[in-house]
Amino acid sequence: MDKRTVRRIVATALAVILAEQVFFLICGFGLPVQFGDTFMGELKSKYERLKETSGKRIVLVGGSGVAFDCDSALMDDFFSSYEIVNFGMYAGLGTKAVMDLSENYIHEGDIVILSPEQGEQTFSDYFNGEYMWQAADGAFGMLRDLKSENFEAMLGNFPRFALEKLNYVMKGQKPQTDSIYQKKSFNTYGDIELDTCRENILPNGYDVNQKVRFTEDVVQPEFMDYMNDWAKRLEKKGAVVWYRYCPVNKLSVEDMDDLAAYDVFLRQKLDFPVIGNPENSLMEAEWFFDTNFHLNQPGKEVNTVQLIRDMKAMLGDDRAVTVELPEKPHRTWGEVPAETRIWTAKDSETYQGEETIVIPENVTQIEDYAFSNCAGLKQIVLEQKDPSKCIVGQHLLDGTGAEILVPQMSVDSYKRNYFWSVYAGRIGEVTAHAEK
């Protein structure tokens, strides 16, 4: 092959690569906003509120546990000289993301309360580029506040984000939103409004896939350092930084006897104060809604009153917090009724060696690792049309390469669902052939 031919091939290849990159850039940045009404679409509003509010603020930082569990209007009644900013978003995005996005806009006089959900992912440097692109759609300026170590994840997820936007534009419809997990569920403070969420809807009163441990190995050592360094930078600006335990469903805790030792460990390792009694974070199941960290409306009120008391204690204010607390909601679970049930690994054993497993519509929860021993499994077919009626955890597909097939017209709902979205890349539409 002569040099001229080689140069032509190289030039053609470079032109194709350049054209591809330009195509992605046009789709990602040039097409209209598509994810603005989704759950992640709320982050830009929280970001703008944090940037624009002046004076002293109480800034609540964490995952969706913060968004669900705090009543900012009630806090406003007791701390009227402060603006309240709820900067809790989504554990699936990563705690680091909200810490990084908030850092440049914390200023002197602020009280910052870091309250991640208790778990290995939230206590690590985990960062999800896919969710970050969805959150930034239409507000790409906030990406400048991300740290350089996350640029690779952002670049790697950009083509998928761009193609998703193009797909929605071509179909003439934006991503479907379901139940409470959408932007319009948030109020101006950044809290999720829970007026219709007053009871525990979990099959056993807690999420069996979300066991909670209070042990030292839950916290990534590097992330402990990251929290301390972050707090120091905020304190240098004149802010006060506290850590507070996120509310946890008591039924989900593996060993409550571990809490005391864990609290000692946390207070020794963190260079900023831990406020409140950790025992108060363990709340009875009746106060929760749909996860082991999401409170229902009555639970939210109870937790917020306790948060106010914790803060007043730190500020040296010994005046009583007199608020009429709501009654505990009635218990909505017991023995799992015959018409609804949880799918376990034992259920999957009967399909050993088969390529397809069909999950009936009456299954309300699928346990983690339920398909890990199903050699040869290719398809998991769900008959449930509404993804919010079947809860799954983070390890649903561990040990299997199977794809998830859902009813027609439900694909987008599953891909955008709070619980199922982590498996979006492996969710497709069921066909008549697959159903057989």
Provide a role label for each language-model segment:
Residues V16, E20-S81, G92-K96, D100:
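Membrane/wall-proximal cationic-aromatic binding patches
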Residues V61, G65-L146:
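Membrane-embedded segments
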Residues M1-I17:
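N-terminal Sec-pathway targeting helices
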Residues N228-D255:
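Active-site segments of SGNH/GDSL-like serine hydrolases
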Residues G129-K237, E324-H330:
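Secreted/periplasmic serine-hydrolase-like ester/acetyl group-modifying domain
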Residues M256-H330:
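C-terminal regions of proteins
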Residues G334-W343, Y351-Q365, C374-C390, T400-S410, ...:
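Structural signature of tandem-repeat unit edges
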Residues E367-A370, G393-L396:
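Consensus positions within tandem repeat domains that build extended binding/scaffold surfaces
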